[in-house]
Each structure stands twice: as C-alpha cells, then as structure tokens.
C-alpha cells in the first residue's frame, strides 16, 4: 500500500511580495514613533538637531477660491506641501490621488492642512485651480491649490522648502517638476520628505502626521 508524502506548501509568491513591504512599513512606523522621533531637515534636505532646526519662511499666495493664503493661515497647523500643475500628464495625477488619501485620513481634523503650489502659475489661475479642485473632489477647507508670481513660487520651492536643488530665477525658461511631498510641523520645521508617487511613502506620511498630532 502506497503512502502519500505530505509536502509543506510554500506561500504564494504574491503574498510575500505584499507582506514584506508591509512588515517594513510597520517596523519603520514603530521605530520612528517610539524610538527616534521624526528628524528635522534643513538646506539640502540634511537632517539636523532640533536646536538648530530652521523654520520655513513666510509666504502669501492665492488659492482656488481667489482667497489669500499665507503663513498666518497655517499658523500652529501641521501641513503637507507639494508642487504640481493642472495640465501635468505624468506624476501629478498620481500625487493628487495620494494627497486625497491623506486628506481623507484627517478629514475630521482642523490641525492638518495640504498646500499644493502650482509651478505653472501663468496658466493655473484661480479659475483653473477651482476646476481642478472640483474634478478631483478637493475640499478647500483643508486643501489649498495655490498660484501667484512664478518668481515667488519658485523661490519658495528652492529656498523655503528645499524641494529642488537646481539653480533658477523663476524666469520663462525655468521649470521645477518634483515628486516630493514635504511635511511641516506646527512650529514651521520641515520634518520629512516623501515620494509622492509611492503608495508606501504615502502611508509613511500619514503615520508621521499622526506622530506630530
């Protein structure tokens, strides 16, 4: 009589592909929250100690409703910044979807805001931004799409949030296209940079915001 040999089944490959990043994410979140705390960032995106941390400079731009949004609007708030343009066919739609996930995660909190700065302000006037907000179901109470002087927007990107390391003066030929999300705490310190096209980085961003709340 033949006996059947029992072989231990190996887990499907797709389960491993899904599980390993999740485990890494959980370990990272625990490490950040309970052990190290979030770092502070300065020029060149270099981590620094809290005592030497820089505060982001002030700003004043116009949102999708034609209202002025400035530093006082987000005083004592935790906020996320990114740079986009409404006609962007590549990374911007993905980044917007990820920011919608962030918005939904803190929908009931007035302590978290999102600011999306246009890098194409000549085309992205308030009306165009309002159309974009409507198309993507963006709640203006917590998420502002900003436009203004290209020179001022580009200067803030480079010298305020250190989003781009290239030189430029905000002129006609100057262009910034970044996939970064930037996390700023209540005191105006930069606490993190994230790949705005990454599902995993978006989850990390949400976890880090919860750490700051």
Which stretches of residues belong to each language-model region?
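Short extracytoplasmic
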Residues: 46-80
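Structural microenvironment flanking redox-active thiols in thiol-disulfide oxidoreductases
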Residues: 96-156
């Amino acid at each position: 009589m033949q006996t059947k040999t029992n072989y231990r089944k190996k887990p499907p490959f797709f389960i491993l592909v899904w599980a390993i990043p999740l485990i890494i994410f959980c370990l990272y979140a625990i490490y950040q929250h309970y052990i190290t705390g979030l770092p502070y960032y300065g020029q060149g995106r270099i981590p620094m100690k809290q005592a030497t941390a820089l505060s982001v400079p002030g700003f004043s731009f116009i949102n999708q409703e034609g209202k002025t949004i400035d530093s006082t609007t987000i005083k004592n708030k935790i906020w996320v910044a990114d740079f986009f343009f409404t006609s962007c066919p590549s990374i911007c739609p993905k980044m917007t979807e990820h920011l919608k996930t962030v918005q939904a995660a803190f929908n009931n909190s007035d302590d978290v805001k999102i600011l999306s700065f246009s890098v194409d302000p000549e085309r992205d006037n308030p009306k165009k931004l309002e159309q974009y907000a409507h198309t993507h179901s963006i709640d203006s109470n917590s998420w502002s799409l900003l436009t203004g002087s290209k020179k001022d927007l580009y200067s803030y990107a480079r010298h305020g949030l250190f989003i781009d390391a290239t030189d430029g003066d905000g002129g006609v030929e100057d262009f910034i296209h970044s996939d970064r999300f930037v996390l700023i705490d209540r005191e105006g310190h930069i606490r993190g940079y994230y790949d705005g096209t990454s599902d995993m980085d978006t989850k990390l961003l949400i976890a880090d915001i919860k750490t700051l709340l």
